Protein backbone atom coordinates (compact mmCIF):
# COMPACT_ATOMS: atom_id res chain seq x y z
CA UNK A 1 0.00 0.00 0.00
CA UNK A 2 1.56 3.30 -1.05
CA UNK A 3 2.11 6.19 1.31
CA UNK A 4 -0.56 8.89 1.10
CA UNK A 5 -0.04 12.66 0.87
CA UNK A 6 -0.60 13.25 4.56
CA UNK A 7 1.94 10.58 5.53
CA UNK A 8 4.44 12.02 3.01
CA UNK A 9 4.12 15.49 4.51
CA UNK A 10 4.39 14.15 8.06
CA UNK A 11 7.50 12.15 7.23
CA UNK A 12 9.07 15.05 5.34
CA UNK A 13 8.42 17.36 8.27
CA UNK A 14 9.92 14.88 10.71
CA UNK A 15 13.00 14.49 8.51
CA UNK A 16 13.59 18.24 8.14
CA UNK A 17 13.05 18.88 11.84
CA UNK A 18 15.50 16.16 12.79
CA UNK A 19 18.12 17.48 10.38
CA UNK A 20 17.68 21.01 11.69
CA UNK A 21 18.40 19.77 15.21
CA UNK A 22 21.52 17.96 14.04
CA UNK A 23 20.12 14.50 14.64
CA UNK A 24 22.15 11.66 13.11
CA UNK A 25 20.83 9.97 9.99
CA UNK A 26 20.45 6.61 11.73
CA UNK A 27 18.29 8.19 14.42
CA UNK A 28 16.27 9.98 11.76
CA UNK A 29 15.77 6.68 9.94
CA UNK A 30 14.59 4.98 13.13
CA UNK A 31 12.17 7.82 13.85
CA UNK A 32 10.73 7.68 10.34
CA UNK A 33 10.38 3.89 10.55
CA UNK A 34 8.53 4.19 13.85
CA UNK A 35 6.23 6.78 12.32
CA UNK A 36 5.64 4.57 9.28
CA UNK A 37 4.83 1.60 11.53
CA UNK A 38 2.27 3.66 13.44
CA UNK A 39 0.69 4.79 10.17
CA UNK A 40 0.01 1.14 9.29
CA UNK A 41 -1.74 0.32 12.58
CA UNK A 42 -5.50 -0.01 12.17
CA UNK A 43 -7.61 0.66 15.23
CA UNK A 44 -11.11 -0.65 15.86
CA UNK A 45 -13.36 1.07 18.36
CA UNK A 46 -14.78 -1.81 20.38
CA UNK A 47 -18.40 -1.36 21.40
CA UNK A 48 -18.11 -0.66 25.12
CA UNK A 49 -15.47 2.05 24.74
CA UNK A 50 -17.91 4.33 22.95
CA UNK A 51 -21.23 3.10 24.32
CA UNK A 52 -21.81 6.09 26.59
CA UNK A 53 -24.09 5.33 29.52
CA UNK A 54 -24.79 1.72 28.49
CA UNK A 55 -24.43 -0.76 31.37
CA UNK A 56 -23.05 -4.27 30.75
CA UNK A 57 -25.26 -7.23 31.70
CA UNK A 58 -28.33 -5.06 32.26
CA UNK A 59 -31.48 -4.19 30.34
CA UNK A 60 -29.76 -0.95 29.22
CA UNK A 61 -26.92 -2.28 27.08
CA UNK A 62 -27.61 -0.08 24.04
CA UNK A 63 -25.50 3.03 23.48
CA UNK A 64 -26.62 6.51 24.46
CA UNK A 65 -24.79 7.82 21.37
CA UNK A 66 -26.42 7.72 17.95
CA UNK A 67 -25.00 5.16 15.53
CA UNK A 68 -24.11 7.71 12.85
CA UNK A 69 -22.49 10.01 15.40
CA UNK A 70 -20.28 7.17 16.64
CA UNK A 71 -19.25 6.13 13.14
CA UNK A 72 -18.44 9.67 12.07
CA UNK A 73 -16.52 10.51 15.25
CA UNK A 74 -14.37 7.39 14.99
CA UNK A 75 -13.74 7.81 11.27
CA UNK A 76 -12.77 11.46 11.69
CA UNK A 77 -10.09 10.51 14.22
CA UNK A 78 -8.67 7.70 12.10
CA UNK A 79 -10.40 4.51 13.25
CA UNK A 80 -11.06 1.98 10.49
CA UNK A 81 -13.12 -0.45 12.57
CA UNK A 82 -16.13 -0.45 14.87
CA UNK A 83 -17.78 -2.87 17.26
CA UNK A 84 -21.53 -3.35 17.68
CA UNK A 85 -23.14 -5.20 20.62
CA UNK A 86 -26.23 -7.31 19.96
CA UNK A 87 -28.55 -5.23 22.18
CA UNK A 88 -27.29 -2.04 20.56
CA UNK A 89 -27.87 -3.54 17.11
CA UNK A 90 -31.46 -4.36 18.01
CA UNK A 91 -31.92 -0.79 19.27
CA UNK A 92 -30.45 0.73 16.11
CA UNK A 93 -32.70 -1.43 13.93
CA UNK A 94 -35.75 0.18 15.53
CA UNK A 95 -35.04 3.28 13.41
CA UNK A 96 -32.54 2.19 10.75
CA UNK A 97 -32.16 -0.75 8.39
CA UNK A 98 -29.06 -2.90 8.02
CA UNK A 99 -28.68 -1.51 4.51
CA UNK A 100 -28.65 2.04 5.88
CA UNK A 101 -26.13 1.07 8.54
CA UNK A 102 -23.88 -0.43 5.86
CA UNK A 103 -24.06 2.77 3.83
CA UNK A 104 -23.08 4.89 6.83
CA UNK A 105 -20.13 2.61 7.55
CA UNK A 106 -18.98 2.64 3.92
CA UNK A 107 -19.36 6.40 3.58
CA UNK A 108 -16.97 6.83 6.51
CA UNK A 109 -14.38 4.23 5.57
CA UNK A 110 -15.19 1.85 8.43
CA UNK A 111 -14.20 -1.47 6.86
CA UNK A 112 -13.70 -3.67 9.92
CA UNK A 113 -17.01 -4.44 11.62
CA UNK A 114 -17.07 -6.51 14.79
CA UNK A 115 -20.34 -7.98 16.05
CA UNK A 116 -20.85 -9.33 19.56
CA UNK A 117 -21.80 -11.24 21.68
CA UNK A 118 -23.09 -14.81 21.47
CA UNK A 119 -23.24 -16.55 24.85
CA UNK A 120 -24.67 -19.99 25.69
CA UNK A 121 -24.00 -21.35 22.17
CA UNK A 122 -22.89 -24.68 23.70
CA UNK A 123 -25.76 -25.34 26.14
CA UNK A 124 -29.32 -26.62 25.85
CA UNK A 125 -32.68 -25.48 27.19
CA UNK A 126 -34.10 -21.97 27.50
CA UNK A 127 -30.67 -20.36 27.61
CA UNK A 128 -29.92 -21.85 24.20
CA UNK A 129 -33.24 -20.61 22.82
CA UNK A 130 -32.29 -17.04 23.75
CA UNK A 131 -28.76 -17.57 22.47
CA UNK A 132 -30.07 -18.72 19.10
CA UNK A 133 -32.11 -15.53 18.76
CA UNK A 134 -28.95 -13.48 19.22
CA UNK A 135 -27.14 -15.81 16.85
CA UNK A 136 -29.74 -15.25 14.11
CA UNK A 137 -29.66 -11.48 14.62
CA UNK A 138 -25.89 -11.26 14.38
CA UNK A 139 -25.58 -13.65 11.45
CA UNK A 140 -28.09 -11.64 9.43
CA UNK A 141 -26.25 -8.44 10.30
CA UNK A 142 -22.87 -9.97 9.51
CA UNK A 143 -23.95 -10.79 5.98
CA UNK A 144 -25.27 -7.31 5.21
CA UNK A 145 -22.56 -5.37 7.05
CA UNK A 146 -19.72 -7.58 5.75
CA UNK A 147 -18.61 -8.14 9.34
CA UNK A 148 -15.02 -9.16 10.00
CA UNK A 149 -16.10 -11.51 12.78
CA UNK A 150 -18.59 -12.33 15.51
CA UNK A 151 -17.35 -12.62 19.09
CA UNK A 152 -18.51 -15.53 21.23
CA UNK A 153 -17.70 -16.89 24.66
CA UNK A 154 -19.06 -17.50 28.14
CA UNK A 155 -19.47 -15.21 31.15
CA UNK A 156 -20.44 -17.78 33.77
CA UNK A 157 -17.87 -20.57 33.73
CA UNK A 158 -20.36 -23.21 32.62
CA UNK A 159 -18.23 -26.35 32.74
CA UNK A 160 -18.82 -28.33 29.55
CA UNK A 161 -17.12 -31.44 28.09
CA UNK A 162 -14.60 -30.58 25.39
CA UNK A 163 -16.27 -32.76 22.72
CA UNK A 164 -19.48 -30.74 23.17
CA UNK A 165 -17.57 -27.46 22.87
CA UNK A 166 -15.78 -28.63 19.74
CA UNK A 167 -18.99 -29.75 18.07
CA UNK A 168 -20.86 -26.58 19.06
CA UNK A 169 -18.07 -24.28 17.92
CA UNK A 170 -17.76 -26.11 14.59
CA UNK A 171 -21.50 -25.69 13.98
CA UNK A 172 -21.32 -22.02 14.87
CA UNK A 173 -18.45 -21.56 12.41
CA UNK A 174 -20.42 -23.35 9.69
CA UNK A 175 -23.35 -20.99 10.22
CA UNK A 176 -20.99 -18.01 10.13
CA UNK A 177 -19.36 -19.24 6.92
CA UNK A 178 -22.78 -19.20 5.26
CA UNK A 179 -23.02 -15.53 6.29
CA UNK A 180 -19.54 -14.78 4.98
CA UNK A 181 -17.94 -14.06 8.33
CA UNK A 182 -15.71 -15.57 11.02
CA UNK A 183 -16.18 -16.60 14.65
CA UNK A 184 -13.71 -15.55 17.34
CA UNK A 185 -13.74 -17.12 20.79
CA UNK A 186 -12.84 -14.68 23.57
CA UNK A 187 -10.71 -16.42 26.18
CA UNK A 188 -11.60 -15.13 29.68
CA UNK A 189 -10.74 -16.15 33.23
CA UNK A 190 -14.47 -16.46 33.97
CA UNK A 191 -15.43 -18.62 30.98
CA UNK A 192 -15.94 -22.36 30.55
CA UNK A 193 -12.54 -22.41 28.84
CA UNK A 194 -10.02 -20.33 30.76
CA UNK A 195 -6.65 -21.48 29.48
CA UNK A 196 -4.86 -20.92 26.21
CA UNK A 197 -4.15 -24.64 25.89
CA UNK A 198 -7.84 -25.58 26.10
CA UNK A 199 -8.76 -22.80 23.69
CA UNK A 200 -6.35 -24.20 21.12
CA UNK A 201 -7.69 -27.71 21.73
CA UNK A 202 -11.20 -26.52 20.89
CA UNK A 203 -10.07 -24.61 17.81
CA UNK A 204 -7.98 -27.49 16.52
CA UNK A 205 -10.81 -29.93 17.13
CA UNK A 206 -13.36 -27.77 15.31
CA UNK A 207 -10.86 -27.30 12.47
CA UNK A 208 -12.89 -24.48 10.91
CA UNK A 209 -11.16 -22.20 8.42
CA UNK A 210 -13.18 -19.26 9.74
CA UNK A 211 -12.83 -20.06 13.45
CA UNK A 212 -10.26 -18.65 15.83
CA UNK A 213 -9.68 -16.61 18.96
CA UNK A 214 -9.51 -12.98 19.98
CA UNK A 215 -6.97 -11.99 22.62
CA UNK A 216 -8.04 -9.26 25.05
CA UNK A 217 -5.12 -7.92 27.09
CA UNK A 218 -7.27 -7.62 30.21
CA UNK A 219 -7.98 -11.34 30.13
CA UNK A 220 -4.44 -12.22 29.07
CA UNK A 221 -2.92 -10.50 32.10
CA UNK A 222 -5.58 -11.71 34.53
CA UNK A 223 -5.09 -15.31 33.41
CA UNK A 224 -1.34 -14.81 33.40
CA UNK A 225 -0.53 -16.14 29.94
CA UNK A 226 3.26 -15.95 29.41
CA UNK A 227 4.42 -13.88 26.46
CA UNK A 228 6.33 -16.90 25.16
CA UNK A 229 3.05 -18.81 24.80
CA UNK A 230 1.41 -15.89 23.02
CA UNK A 231 4.29 -15.77 20.55
CA UNK A 232 3.67 -19.43 19.68
CA UNK A 233 -0.04 -19.11 18.87
CA UNK A 234 -0.62 -20.35 15.30
CA UNK A 235 -1.45 -17.35 13.14
CA UNK A 236 -4.41 -19.16 11.56
CA UNK A 237 -6.15 -19.13 14.94
CA UNK A 238 -5.30 -15.55 15.93
CA UNK A 239 -8.12 -13.58 14.34
CA UNK A 240 -8.44 -10.58 16.63
CA UNK A 241 -6.80 -8.52 19.37
CA UNK A 242 -8.21 -6.09 21.93
CA UNK A 243 -6.07 -3.65 23.90
CA UNK A 244 -6.69 -2.04 27.27
CA UNK A 245 -4.93 -1.60 30.60
CA UNK A 246 -5.71 -2.37 34.21
CA UNK A 247 -4.58 -3.58 37.62
CA UNK A 248 -2.39 -6.63 37.89
CA UNK A 249 -4.12 -7.30 41.21
CA UNK A 250 -7.65 -6.10 41.86
CA UNK A 251 -8.22 -3.63 44.71
CA UNK A 252 -9.31 -5.35 47.91
CA UNK A 253 -13.00 -6.19 47.97
CA UNK A 254 -13.51 -5.83 44.21
CA UNK A 255 -14.86 -8.88 42.36
CA UNK A 256 -13.50 -9.88 38.98
CA UNK A 257 -16.88 -9.12 37.42
CA UNK A 258 -16.85 -5.61 38.89
CA UNK A 259 -13.30 -5.05 37.74
CA UNK A 260 -13.74 -6.24 34.17
CA UNK A 261 -16.97 -4.28 33.57
CA UNK A 262 -16.14 -1.07 35.40
CA UNK A 263 -12.45 -0.59 36.12
CA UNK A 264 -10.46 -1.20 32.96
CA UNK A 265 -8.12 1.61 31.98
CA UNK A 266 -6.85 3.24 28.83
CA UNK A 267 -3.62 1.89 27.39
CA UNK A 268 -0.57 3.14 29.27
CA UNK A 269 -2.59 4.21 32.31
CA UNK A 270 -2.53 0.91 34.19
CA UNK A 271 -0.03 -1.77 35.19
CA UNK A 272 -0.01 -4.08 32.17
CA UNK A 273 3.16 -4.53 30.12
CA UNK A 274 1.42 -3.73 26.85
CA UNK A 275 4.59 -3.20 24.86
CA UNK A 276 5.84 -6.61 25.97
CA UNK A 277 2.53 -8.09 24.87
CA UNK A 278 2.74 -6.38 21.48
CA UNK A 279 6.31 -7.58 21.00
CA UNK A 280 5.17 -11.17 21.63
CA UNK A 281 2.19 -10.69 19.36
CA UNK A 282 4.44 -9.44 16.55
CA UNK A 283 6.21 -12.80 16.56
CA UNK A 284 2.96 -14.49 15.52
CA UNK A 285 2.76 -12.40 12.36
CA UNK A 286 -0.59 -10.84 13.33
CA UNK A 287 -1.41 -7.91 11.03
CA UNK A 288 -5.11 -7.32 11.65
CA UNK A 289 -6.81 -4.37 13.36
CA UNK A 290 -6.46 -3.74 17.08
CA UNK A 291 -9.65 -3.26 19.05
CA UNK A 292 -9.74 -0.88 22.00
CA UNK A 293 -12.07 -2.18 24.70
CA UNK A 294 -12.37 0.00 27.79
CA UNK A 295 -15.17 -0.70 30.27
CA UNK A 296 -14.93 1.95 32.96
CA UNK A 297 -17.50 3.54 35.24
CA UNK A 298 -16.11 7.06 34.78
CA UNK A 299 -15.93 6.69 31.00
CA UNK A 300 -19.71 6.30 30.81
CA UNK A 301 -20.08 10.03 31.51
CA UNK A 302 -17.53 11.21 28.93
CA UNK A 303 -18.58 13.06 25.77
CA UNK A 304 -18.12 10.96 22.63
CA UNK A 305 -15.37 13.09 21.08
CA UNK A 306 -13.29 13.04 24.26
CA UNK A 307 -13.54 9.26 24.52
CA UNK A 308 -12.61 8.78 20.87
CA UNK A 309 -9.61 11.10 21.06
CA UNK A 310 -8.23 9.66 24.28
CA UNK A 311 -8.70 6.05 23.23
CA UNK A 312 -6.99 6.66 19.91
CA UNK A 313 -3.94 8.56 21.16
CA UNK A 314 -3.23 6.40 24.22
CA UNK A 315 -3.47 3.19 22.21
CA UNK A 316 -1.37 4.35 19.28
CA UNK A 317 1.33 5.44 21.72
CA UNK A 318 1.89 1.78 22.65
CA UNK A 319 3.29 1.09 19.18
CA UNK A 320 6.21 3.51 19.49
CA UNK A 321 9.53 3.08 21.25
What is the predicted role of each segment?
Residues 142-160, 179, 185-188:
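Active-site groove signature of glycoside hydrolases
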Residues 2-143, 177, 208-212, 235-238, ...:
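N-terminal pre-domain/capping segments
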Residues 45-49, 84-88, 114-119, 152-154, ...:
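A cross-domain feature marking catalytic cores of carbohydrate-active enzymes
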Residues 253, 263-265, 288, 292-298:
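Active-site clefts of carbohydrate-active enzymes
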Residues 62, 85-97, 120-131, 155-163, ...:
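Acidic-and-aromatic substrate-binding clefts and catalytic sites of carbohydrate-active enzymes
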Residues 96-100, 128-136, 162-170, 197-200, ...:
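Charged helix-capping and loop-helix junction motifs
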Residues 81, 149, 240, 288-289:
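Residues at the N-termini of beta-strands
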Residues 81-82, 171-271, 278:
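Acidic/histidine-rich catalytic cores of soluble enzymes
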